[in-house]
Amino acid sequence: MSTREIRIATRKSALALWQAEYVKARLEQAHPGLLVTLVPMVSRGDKLLDAPLAKIGGKGLFVKELETALLDNEADIAVHSMKDVPMDFPEGLGLYCICEREDPRDAFVSNRFSSLDALPAGSIVGTSSLRRQAQLLARRPDLQIRFLRGNVNTRLAKLDAGEYDAIILAAAGLIRLGFEERITASISVDDSLPAGGQGAVGIECRSADSEIHALLAPLHHTDTADRVVAERALNKHLNGGCQVPIACYAVLEGEQLWLRGLVGQPSGGTLLMADARAPRASAETLGVQVAEDLLGQGAAAILKEVYGEAGHP
């Protein structure tokens, strides 16, 4: 294969740059002599930090500019946090690589309290996620949830300034940025089911670029990919493209996938849960099956209410 340059479109946040540098290093390791460069960009989601994601269009805000760069041939691949990747791709683009997953759990971070259960009634907890909010309030309705956006450093600084008693972040982001010691406690997936794809990094590129597909192949982690395919299929069947209180998490048990799904009212008043098992080759079908179970329990009404509040269909 001819040596060529690969240009990586990435957001400018510290975590996005870490992920892009990780992919760059993996590509250079797999293909000595390959020139890999970063094309940092500012996404609309990075500019609009004063409103909840659900109200400004959801997580697709973080990828649109990167996709435009791919379509305009200003970059060859785009590196994303899988939990930020919308279900559908523009014509001519697709997801061609999913890297090995980091810790998928949510992390409890506090300077004063050792765990969620140790928080006194009325404590202020920061999160930007309706998924986390729904599960937190279902478990601890006596807590106050306060909106929290910004990059990891900004969120930690707000905690350190005393604006919150605790904040909830993805463990993977803290670990990757070297803040693992800030994790007061990792929250079990039984207590806070993660977002689909949480902890995994995905690589998007042009569908017709077979040479790039071949270069990416050594980075693809099949065990992670099968799990994420099931999670994304559940999300897609629930039309979970926006920032909504949907959680899903798949694990491999030998050659079987076990998928758990959850839809909750942001108030925590109702949490709907479903799970099922299937051969890993049926990952997508499994996602649809668990989503159908949730719909049968009334998930559509909860999601419609949330979409209505966010101003989306």
Curated annotation (Swiss-Prot):
Co-factor requirement: dipyrromethane
Catalytic activity: 4 porphobilinogen + H2O = hydroxymethylbilane + 4 NH4(+)
Coiled-coil positions: none
Positions of modified residues (S-(dipyrrolylmethanemethyl)cysteine): 242
Keyword Transferase: yes
Record note on cofactor: Binds 1 dipyrromethane group covalently.
EC assignment: 2.5.1.61
Family: Belongs to the HMBS family.
NCBIfam families found in the cross-reference section: hemC (TIGR00212)
Chain's role: Tetrapolymerization of the monopyrrole PBG into the hydroxymethylbilane pre-uroporphyrinogen in several discrete steps.
Other remarks on this protein: The porphobilinogen subunits are added to the dipyrromethane group.
Classification via HAMAP family: Porphobil_deam
Subunit architecture: Monomer.
Protein name per its UniProtKB record: Porphobilinogen deaminase
Originating species: Pseudomonas putida (strain W619)
Gene name tied to this protein: hemC
